[in-house]
Amino acid sequence: CGRRRGSLAWPDASSPSANPRPGAGAAESSACTTSGWSRWRTSLLVAGALLGLQWLPQLAGLWVACFGFGTGACIILALMFMGLRTENPRQAAALSGMAQCVGYLLAAFGPPLVGGLRDRSQDWNPALTVCLVLSLTMAAAGMLAGRNRRIRSASTAASTPAAG
């Protein structure tokens, strides 16, 4: 696989390396072969945008654009990893349902909580700091989710003898 696949936003996101699934398509190959840096740099873009809003608010347009690109890329990668890291469609559906439940709960309660924090402190810095910590947590989760591993079902794990 000597070809490089990428996009305008992340031209090196699909560095060539061994793909765990033979015959994988471009998107699957890209997600499976991204380097450690590529997997979590979208979350770092979000973190950088939040830091920029705190330190250089006069460039808010730039930081909001970076935040939008970063969060958009994060959701695409999250959805892609759910399908790529599971063994079958049923497992992918279960993982997707769990992740979307948590995601929608955060989407429902996060903005009012952050808004309440902003109202209570009369400053955006504490709210932006909370979001920064969450984006760094998301970067760590992205590193774990992007590892070249599969989520094994309980029945597969039980039928496979333990190594060692």
Swiss-Prot record:
<keyword id="KW-1133">Transmembrane helix</keyword>
<keyword id="KW-0472">Membrane</keyword>
<keyword id="KW-0813">Transport</keyword>
<protein>
    <recommendedName>
        <fullName>Putative anionic 4-hydroxy-benzoate permease</fullName>
    </recommendedName>
</protein>
<comment type="similarity">
    <text>Belongs to the major facilitator superfamily. Cyanate porter (TC 2.A.1.17) family.</text>
</comment>
<comment type="function">
    <text>May be involved in uptake of anionic 4-hydroxy-benzoate.</text>
</comment>
<feature type="transmembrane region" description="Helical">
    <location>
        <begin position="126"/>
        <end position="146"/>
    </location>
</feature>
<keyword id="KW-1003">Cell membrane</keyword>
<feature type="region of interest" description="Disordered">
    <location>
        <begin position="1"/>
        <end position="30"/>
    </location>
</feature>
<dbReference type="InterPro" id="IPR036259">
    <property type="entry name" value="MFS_trans_sf"/>
</dbReference>
<feature type="transmembrane region" description="Helical">
    <location>
        <begin position="97"/>
        <end position="117"/>
    </location>
</feature>
<keyword id="KW-0812">Transmembrane</keyword>
<dbReference type="GO" id="GO:0005886">
    <property type="term" value="C:plasma membrane"/>
</dbReference>
<feature type="transmembrane region" description="Helical">
    <location>
        <begin position="62"/>
        <end position="82"/>
    </location>
</feature>
<dbReference type="InterPro" id="IPR052524">
    <property type="entry name" value="MFS_Cyanate_Porter"/>
</dbReference>
